[in-house]
Each structure stands twice: as C-alpha cells, then as structure tokens.
Amino acid sequence: MRTFVVLLLASVAFCFAQAAPQSDTLLIKKRNPLKNASFMFSAGNKSPDMPVGVWRNAGNKTSTGTIVWFHGGMTSNNCQKGLVAGGSLANMLPDYTVVSASACKQNHWVEPTTIEAVDDALDSLAKRQKKDIEEISLIGISDGSLGVITYSLWGKRKIKNRILMSTYGESLGPAAQVAAQTPLKNGRWRFIQGGADRLYPSEKAVPWIQEFCQNVGTQCDLKFDPQGEHDWSYWQNKHKDWILEIFSK
C-alpha cells in the first residue's frame, strides 16, 4: 500500500514537472519594533531557489511554536510568494513564528526537493536562533494543502497540528490509500471546506475528506460552510475561530 502511494505521488510530481536551481538565502521578517524590517541569511546549499519569509517576535520573547504556511498557486510563475504569503497568518497568531516558503513552476509542493528545502530553511532558522525546531504545525490553502500532506509524508519534523483549507486531496490518490500511510497517523488534522468553492466543488472534495478522516487513525475533523469560498481571505474574515481554536489547546 505504501509503495503504491509513494509511486502515485512520484507520478503526480512528474506531471507537475521537475528540476531545482540552487540558492543560499532565506528572508527573515521581524515584528515590532522593527516593523517591516528584513535581513538575509543562509538557508543552506541544498535548497532549491526558494525565497522564504519568516515572521517572529523581535527581541528575546519566546515563540509559542513554529507554523509553516503553504500558499496556493504552487505552479505559478511567481517564485517569491512566500515573502508575503504568511503575513496575515502572522498577524492572526502573533505569538508564533510563521515560516512561509515559496513554490512555483516545477518546484511545487508535490516535488520532494521542495519539501527538503522547507526542512533546510527550518534548519537554518534553528541555527540562527540557537534553538532546535523539533515540532511544527502546518497550514495550507488551495493546492498549498497538498504541501501539508506531502510534508507529513516526506518532512523530517514532528507535526502537532495541520489545517488544510479549500483543498482537493483526490489529486494525490484515493483517500483511504493516502490515509493508510504511517507518517500521517499522528498529530491533528483539520479540513476547512466551502460549498461555494469556485475551484473544488464540495460534492467532490468533501467525500474525499470524510473518507480520509475515517481512515487516518488520528484526530481529524472537517469544518464546512455551505457559503464558503475558495480564497484565504474568506476564511480569514468569516471563520478565524476555526483556525485559532486549533492553537488554543
């Protein structure tokens, strides 16, 4: 079963395309008193060309935890989405460090080297702050939710919470077969889906989510809004509580 899903993911990655140029920079954005300030540091030579935005408390205040944000539009030509994509989430969860990676073109979320680059960036951040990052939470919107699933399969860190918004998991394979993978059977899963999603109709997306939750063998739930739209702005404005309650426990 595991071999089947790994091969299926590999074929999905091939369909999305491949390759990975080299880079060695990671962008850090600090909060007040250095609002909008930024500086660069090495993300490691293994990384694809992935600009990464990081929002964290200035000074010595301890972060409550680290959240990785996976943006949507993972095959677009904009290869710097991560530099801004995590900003609104950071405002919503100011006590957390938010790491916002960038995917584009052939370096999308279903490409193993892109997931390796996320861990490489986290390694670099941990080195800079002189504190290991052993456990993280993951949040994805649209096809960024596929990044939540693939990091759960391929990433090297323990995962506490996952939120997947406006997703279509069927593109990774049948729900029961995806859910059967051992790395997915820990931590918490929350799916947030809308009945007015312009890209992923609920009659197709919701049954996959329900079957996944039934088979994954760990805490998993679905929050559904019949009027819910596809974009992050809708969930941010209408159902902020569905996101915040995951991080209040």
Per-range role (PLM):
Residues 79-98:
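Short amphipathic alpha-helix adjacent to the substrate-entry channel of hydrolases
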Residues 190-192, 198-249:
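C-terminal catalytic histidine-bearing segment of alpha/beta-hydrolase fold enzymes
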Residues 128, 134-183:
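Primarily recognizes the serine-hydrolase "nucleophile elbow" in alpha/beta-hydrolase
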Residues 109-130:
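Alpha/beta-hydrolase active-site loop
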Residues 17-65, 143, 208-209, 220, ...:
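A domain-start/cap signature at the N-terminus of enzymes
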Residues 63-73:
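Short beta-strand element of the alpha/beta-hydrolase
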Residues 96-116:
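Cap/lid segment of the alpha/beta-hydrolase catalytic domain
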